[in-house]
A protein has these predicted regions:
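Acidic catalytic/metal-coordinating carboxylates
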Residues: 34-37, 60-63
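Alpha4 helix (beta4-alpha4-beta5 surface) of REC/receiver domains from two-component response regulators
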Residues: 15, 63, 84-101
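Receiver (REC) domain active-site loop signature in two-component systems and cognate sites
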Residues: 56
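Active-site beta3 strand of CheY-like receiver
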Residues: 45-51
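CheY-like receiver
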Residues: 119-132
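Two-component/phosphorelay signaling modules centered on CheY-like receiver
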Residues: 10-30
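C-terminal output helix
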Residues: 87, 105-115, 122
Length: 132
C-alpha cells in the first residue's frame, strides 16, 4: 500500500484530500499544515510520498521541498497547488519535485501520478517530473 503525508494549510482541504485518498486505498499517515510540518513528519514517518501545497503561512512549500530533499535526496515529493506559474514549475522541477499537480484536479489523476511514480521507484527507474 502506498503511504503519504498530506501537507496543506487549509485544514478542511487537508481532511477532504486525506479522506479521498483513504477511500482510494492510499495509507494517509498524517496531515501537516506548513513546510516545517512537512519536514518533521517526513523525518518521523518516512512515507512513500509527500503531497505538498506551496502557498502556506510561516514555512512555505519551497522550504519543505528543499529541506526534505536535503534530508533524503530520493524522497518523492508531489507538489499539489493552485496558481503555479511556469517559472515556478521550472524552479520546482529543478529543486527535485517528482510531480506537479495543479488544483483543481481529478482525484483519479492524482492517484495515477502516485501509482506511476511508485512503479518507477520500485523498478529503480529515473524519469522526468510529471506535470499535470
Amino acid at each position: 500500500m502506498i503511504s503519504v503525508i498530506v501537507i496543506e494549510d487549509d485544514h478542511d482541504g487537508a481532511e477532504v484530500l486525506a479522506e479521498c485518498l483513504r477511500i482510494k486505498g492510499i495509507d494517509v499517515l498524517e496531515k501537516g499544515y506548513n513546510g516545517l510540518d512537512a519536514v518533521q513528519l517526513y523525518k518521523k514517518l518516512k512515507p512513500d510520498f509527500v503531497l505538498l501545497d506551496m502557498l502556506m503561512p510561516f514555512y512555505d512549500g519551497f522550504y519543505g521541498l528543499r529541506k526534505i530533499l536535503e534530508f533524503d535526496p530520493k524522497a518523492k515529493v508531489i507538489v499539489v497547488s493552485a496558481s503555479i506559474a511556469e517559472d515556478e514549475k521550472e524552479k520546482l522541477t529543478n529543486l527535485g519535485a517528482s510531480a506537479i499537480v495543479s488544483k483543481p484536479y481529478e482525484m483519479d489523476a492524482l492517484i495515477g501520478v502516485l501509482q506511476t511514480i511508485n512503479r518507477e521507484k520500485e523498478n529503480n527507474l529515473k524519469t522526468r517530473p510529471i506535470i499535470i
